[in-house]
Amino acid sequence: MTRFWIGVVSKEHVLRGVEGGFCQVCHGKKAPLNRMKKGDYLLYYSPKYQMNDQEKLQAFTAVGKILDDTAYQVEMFEDFFPFRRDVSYYQPVKDCPIEQIRQHPQWRQYASQLRYGHFEVSKDFFLYVFDQMKVDRSRNN
């Protein structure tokens, strides 16, 4: 059964993932990535442009489909070895400001979970956000 997820990541880091064809959540932890399976979908929500910046973005910034079954580890820096999953991202997409999503009936349920960094959402909510990003859903299915 296909599941739908949100990952909370700065836009700067989202763009690295889109460019490299991977996802990484919760500062590179393996456990959240292992909850996703091949064929699942991931929406990225970016509260900020850069992780340590104060400037807010508060928008959904990328959407993709998980391509593999297992997380793998990479060396980003000498002492940082995060886990990743391979993703096929839908492109082009445009950022979807959170204001456009707040009217969805399930928004309140999910808004409080953003602080966890990675969580499952309903197909209905996923498709609602997806449509707001004006993505051609026929690609990558």
UniProtKB/Swiss-Prot annotation:
Matching entries from InterPro entries are given as:
EVE_domain, PUA-like_sf, UPF0310
What domain of life does the native source organism fall in?
Bacteria
Family membership noted in the UniProt record? Belongs to the UPF0310 family.
User: What protein is this chain from?
Assistant: UPF0310 protein SGO_1818
Species the sequence originates in: Streptococcus gordonii (strain Challis / ATCC 35105 / BCRC 15272 / CH1 / DL1 / V288)
